[in-house]
Amino acid sequence: MAKLITLGEILIEFNALSPGPLRHVSYFEKHVAGSEANYCVAFIKQGNECGIIAKVGDDEFGYNAIEWLRGQGVDVSHMKIDPSAPTGIFFIQRHYPVPLKSESIYYRKGSAGSKLSPEDVDEEYVKSADLVHSSGITLAISSTAKEAVYKAFEIASNRSFDTNIRLKLWSAEEAKREILKLLSKFHLKFLITDTDDSKIILGESDPDKAAKAFSDYAEIIVMKLGPKGAIVYYDGKKYYSSGYQVPVEDVTGAGDALGGTFLSLYYKGFEMEKALDYAIVASTLNVMIRGDQENLPTTKDIETFLREMKK
C-alpha cells in the first residue's frame, strides 16, 4: 500500500444551493475542501494511504475539517490547530455568469492555513511517504507555506506538483516566476497542469508543446483539458482520454479528483492509460454533485461506471 503526504490549506466551502449571483442566494451547503485535502481523499479511495500537513483554526470549522478528513481515512496526525487565526472559508457561485462554470469567492487572508511553515514539516514523517504532493496554491498563500513546501520537497524521495494557479492569490507574473523556480530546483515524478496554467508559465497553450517543455522538469506529465478529458505524457509517449457528457452541478475540485485518482492508481500498478481512463471517471462523477470530496469514487465504483457508460 503506497503512502502519499500532501501539504496545503484546508478550507470550508459554502456551495450555493441554487445557481445564479450570490447576492440572490439565501442557502448554502457546507463542505470540507482544499486542493491537497481533495487529493488525499481521492488517493485513499483507490486503496492507498494519505496524510496531510496543514493548519486549521481553533474553531468549529477547523474541528469540522479534522473530523471529516479523519472519517475519510486521512492521517490527520500532522494537522495542527492554530488558536491565533481562523480556518479559511470560501463561497461558490454556480452557473453564473457562465453556464456550467463555477466561481470561488475566498475569505482566507490571514487564515490558519496560510500560517503553515517549515516548523510544521516533520522530517521523519515526510521520509515515510512514497510521494509528497503540493500545489501552486500552497506556494501562493504565504511565504512560510512556500518554505514548508521547499523543506518537504528537499526531504521527499518522490515529488508531485499541481500548478493550480489561482489569480486571486497572486499575479500571473509572480505565479510564473515562483513555479519555474520550484521546477528548476526539484525534479518531479509527476507534474499535473492544464493549458491555462501552461500559457501563464511557458507562454504556450498547445498541450504537446507545453508537455515537451515541461519534460525537462518532470518524469510524468498530466495535462488536464477540462470537459475534453486529459493527456498523460511519459517515456516519450502520449495517451489521450476523452471526457464524458454528464449533467454538471459544480466543477470545483474536478481536477483534484483526476489528479489524486491517477496518482493512486499509478501506485497500484495500473498502466498509464488505464490509470488516466479511471481518473477521468473520478473527475466526471465529481462534477455531478456539490462538494469536492463526497462523490469521489472507489475503484469498484469506477468500474461500474465504465461498464454502463459510453463516451
Curated annotation (Swiss-Prot):
Xref: CDD domains: KdgK
Cross-referenced SUPFAM superfamilies: Ribokinase-like
Binding-site residues, ATP: N164, I165, R166, K224, L225, G226, P227, K228, G229, G253, A254, G255, D256, S283
Domain of life: Archaea
Residues that bind substrate: G34, S35, Y106, Y107, R108, R166, G253, D256, D292
Temperature and activity: Optimum temperature is 80 degrees Celsius. Extremely thermostable.
Pathway noted in the entry: Carbohydrate acid metabolism; 2-dehydro-3-deoxy-D-gluconate degradation; D-glyceraldehyde 3-phosphate and pyruvate from 2-dehydro-3-deoxy-D-gluconate: step 1/2
Catalytic activity: 2-dehydro-3-deoxy-D-gluconate + ATP = 2-dehydro-3-deoxy-6-phospho-D-gluconate + ADP + H(+)
Cofactor names: a divalent metal cation
EC number(s) per entry: 2.7.1.45
Cofactor remark: Mg(2+) is the most effective ion, but it can be replaced with Co(2+), Ni(2+), Zn(2+) or Mn(2+).
pH dependence: Optimum pH is around 8.5.
Catalytic residues identified in the record: D256 (proton acceptor)
ATP-binding among keywords: yes
Positions in coiled-coil regions: none
Keyword terms of this UniProt record: ATP-binding, Carbohydrate metabolism, Kinase, Nucleotide-binding, Transferase
GO terms for MF: 2-dehydro-3-deoxygluconokinase activity; ATP binding
Function: Involved in the degradation of glucose via the semi-phosphorylative Entner-Doudoroff pathway. Catalyzes the phosphorylation of 2-keto-3-deoxygluconate (KDG) to produce 2-keto-3-deoxy-6-phosphogluconate (KDPG). Can also use GTP, but not ADP or AMP, as a phosphoryl donor and 2-keto-D-gluconate (KG) as a phosphoryl acceptor.
Self-association and partners: Homotetramer.
Family: Belongs to the carbohydrate kinase PfkB family.
NCBIfam families referenced in this protein's UniProt entry, alphabetically: KDG_KDGal_kin (NF040938)
Protein's UniProt name: 2-dehydro-3-deoxygluconokinase
Organism: Sulfurisphaera tokodaii (strain DSM 16993 / JCM 10545 / NBRC 100140 / 7)
Classification of source organism: Archaea, Thermoproteota, Thermoprotei, Sulfolobales, Sulfolobaceae
Gene symbol of the encoding locus: kdgK
